[in-house]
Amino acid sequence: MIEADRLIQPQVQGQDELIDRAMRPKMLDEYTGQDDTRAQLKVFIQAAINRREALDHMLIFGPPGLGKTTLAMIVANEMGVNIKSTSGPVLEKAGDLAALLTNLEEGDVLFIDEIHRLSPVVEEILYPAMEDYQLDIMIGDGPAARSIKLDLPPFTLIGATTRAGALTSPLRARFGIPLRLEFYNVADLTTIVTRSANVMNLEIDEQGAIEIAKRSRGTPRIANRLLRRVRDYAEVKHDGKVSQTVAEYALDLLDVDDQGFDYLDRKLLLAIIDKFMGGPVGLDNLAAAIGEDRETIEDVLEPFLIQQGFIQRTPRGRIASQRAYDHFSLVRPEKA
């Protein structure tokens, strides 16, 4: 399994959630990046407000750390309603979901993170709640058991997932607004780093912010985490200001290279290059070679490497691209 303290891990770790909450934008106009998604949301939200209706149910999907929870909170703020948050693994029984649904007020947002991990029993309860705003509850046991229907106020369910394909078709079909989040570009991440530095009362110049953004793997959560570590270095070893030189030295010390790779990324790429002659290599063999599981490779390591063109996923397996060889200053062997 992947190490919990991996600095460039996109999943929440340590105090990330608490610190990220302080840095989160509250409204769409404060939100940086994801331009198409933002433009769509503005239209959908304004239309719902004009009609005085609850916003349609929304599925937000994409790699971890890109702001799915932040967007859900922004939607609630823009609509002027409350938000109740939970996650798929927490909702073990139908009663867990029923307790949340019956406490919603009209227009409220129910946010379920990792919605692909809902149990089938809980998912069945969710269908009529999403479609008809009704909750079917079984009263009693055995032959005397009977079903009663409770009316729910109109509400908005926002589901978030890193694995949209793992959702069942009936559940996926009930979301009227599907939104895919993409990795951020360096310019948008630079803006995010600068904004976060201002929240932290940290002095940072443009080149320092760019250097952190370049090594953040297109992910705001990683950018904010790297910024905090660079701040530590700047305060202890320098005058507390973050310049390009300070950022470069601190991140090199943290073993995050100029592509945002750490030892595990390099281990994966070099395994394909050295152990499997550049590929193709099957996922199971690759997982065994680097001592990680399939899910870690597919959900955590691969997306960024594929998006940046270092790995190609083919029907026969994974292949290291020319860019991967160039990164390590290696010559790509010619295939027979």
Curated annotation (Swiss-Prot):
InterPro entries: AAA+_ATPase, AAA_lid_4, DNA_helicase_Holl-junc_RuvB, P-loop_NTPase, RuvB-like_N, RuvB_C, WH-like_DNA-bd_sf, WH_DNA-bd_sf. GO terms for biological process: DNA recombination; DNA repair. DNA binds at R294, R313, R318. Its main location: cytoplasm. Has 3 domains, the large (RuvB-L) and small ATPase (RuvB-S) domains and the C-terminal head (RuvB-H) domain. The head domain binds DNA, while the ATPase domains jointly bind ATP, ADP or are empty depending on the state of the subunit in the translocation cycle. During a single DNA translocation step the structure of each domain remains the same, but their relative positions change. It holds the Pfam family RuvB_N. Residues 185-255 are annotated as: Small ATPAse domain (RuvB-S). Disulfide bonds: none annotated. Homohexamer. Forms an RuvA(8)-RuvB(12)-Holliday junction (HJ) complex. HJ DNA is sandwiched between 2 RuvA tetramers; dsDNA enters through RuvA and exits via RuvB. An RuvB hexamer assembles on each DNA strand where it exits the tetramer. Each RuvB hexamer is contacted by two RuvA subunits (via domain III) on 2 adjacent RuvB subunits; this complex drives branch migration. In the full resolvosome a probable DNA-RuvA(4)-RuvB(12)-RuvC(2) complex forms which resolves the HJ. Belongs to the RuvB family. Mg(2+) binds at T69. It catalyses: ATP + H2O = ADP + phosphate + H(+). Residues 258-336 are annotated as: Head domain (RuvB-H). ATP binds at R24, G65, K68, T69, T70, E131, D132, Y133, R174, Y184, R221. One of its GO terms (molecular function) is ATP binding. It is found in: Cytoplasm. This is Holliday junction branch migration complex subunit RuvB. GO terms for cellular component: cytoplasm; Holliday junction resolvase complex. Residues 4-184 are annotated as: Large ATPase domain (RuvB-L). Its EC number is 3.6.4.-. It is an enzyme of class 3 (hydrolase). Keywords: ATP-binding, Cytoplasm, DNA damage, DNA recombination, DNA repair, DNA-binding, Hydrolase, Nucleotide-binding. The RuvA-RuvB-RuvC complex processes Holliday junction (HJ) DNA during genetic recombination and DNA repair, while the RuvA-RuvB complex plays an important role in the rescue of blocked DNA replication forks via replication fork reversal (RFR). RuvA specifically binds to HJ cruciform DNA, conferring on it an open structure. The RuvB hexamer acts as an ATP-dependent pump, pulling dsDNA into and through the RuvAB complex. RuvB forms 2 homohexamers on either side of HJ DNA bound by 1 or 2 RuvA tetramers; 4 subunits per hexamer contact DNA at a time.
